[in-house]
């Protein structure tokens, strides 16, 4: 094609069939859109390019033919397939512990081992003629009952003061009174349990073992 024809074709002065060069090919596609309008190079990226490399396409095809869901591998964050566990699990309590009585168990379950005491010796502590056989337990409600404690102790009777039901202020006053009373009459004043004290006259010798047994058996609670 000559230069003159090219100029004419450029300005639309030459027929299109005369415009023949390497840029036009009769075998090429027509000017109409034979492909979808929005199809471009991005359409060449098919879904398989983004598939998980760990998946087997053949397994997916077989699952599709059987009508079953494809077996996908677990997500990366849960690799290992740990089984789900209940967040809150009921606690199993020992039925023996639940059935064990909370109060008075020391009567049915005697102390064993090095702290155990011969039942005969335990009975001898409170049998007639033993100094502790006439022991008495007083449970004052307020400080006004201090007189009763003093009279019993002055008569030579061992006294157990159970101050559990008293408020701390009155209990402290009564403890101070009993300690002074025991000192004045040459007796002894010992703590047996929490807010429980034993006043022993001068002629009554209460050994540490006997005091421990009084506390362990709760003897003062049944008088």
Curated annotation (Swiss-Prot):
- Where is the protein found, in the record's own terms? Cytoplasm
Q: Record's Pfam families?
A: SepF
Recorded superkingdom? Bacteria
Gene Ontology cellular component annotations, sorted alphabetically: cytoplasm
- The main location is cytoplasm
Q: Cell cycle among the record's keywords?
A: yes
Q: Which family does it belong to?
A: Belongs to the SepF family.
Q: How does it assemble?
A: Homodimer. Interacts with FtsZ.
Protein's name according to its UniProt entry: Cell division protein SepF
Q: Which organism is it from?
A: Mycobacterium marinum (strain ATCC BAA-535 / M)
Read off the lineage from the record. Answer: Bacteria, Bacillati, Actinomycetota, Actinomycetes, Mycobacteriales
């Amino acid at each position: 094609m000559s230069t003159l024809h090219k100029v004419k074709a450029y300005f639309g002065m030459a027929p299109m069939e005369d415009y023949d060069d390497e840029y036009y090919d009769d075998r090429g596609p027509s000017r109409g859109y034979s492909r979808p309008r929005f199809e471009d190079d991005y359409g060449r990226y098919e879904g398989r390019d983004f598939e998980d490399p760990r998946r087997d396409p053949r397994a997916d095809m077989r699952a599709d033919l059987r009508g079953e869901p494809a077996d996908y591998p677990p997500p990366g964050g849960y690799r290992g397939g740990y089984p789900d566990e209940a967040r809150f699990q009921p606690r199993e309590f020992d039925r023996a512990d639940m059935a064990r009585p909370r109060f008075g168990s020391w009567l049915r379950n005697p102390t064993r081992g090095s702290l155990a005491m011969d039942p005969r010796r335990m009975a001898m502590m409170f049998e007639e003629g033993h100094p502790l056989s006439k022991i008495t337990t007083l449970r004052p409600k307020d400080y006004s009952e201090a007189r009763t404690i003093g009279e019993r102790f002055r008569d030579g009777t061992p006294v157990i003061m159970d101050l559990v039901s008293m408020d701390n202020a009155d209990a402290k006053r009564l403890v101070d009174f009993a300690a002074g009373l025991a000192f004045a009459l040459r007796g002894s004043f010992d703590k047996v349990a929490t807010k429980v004290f034993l006043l022993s006259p001068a002629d009554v010798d209460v050994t540490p073992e006997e005091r421990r047994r009084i506390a362990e058996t709760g003897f003062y609670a049944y008088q």
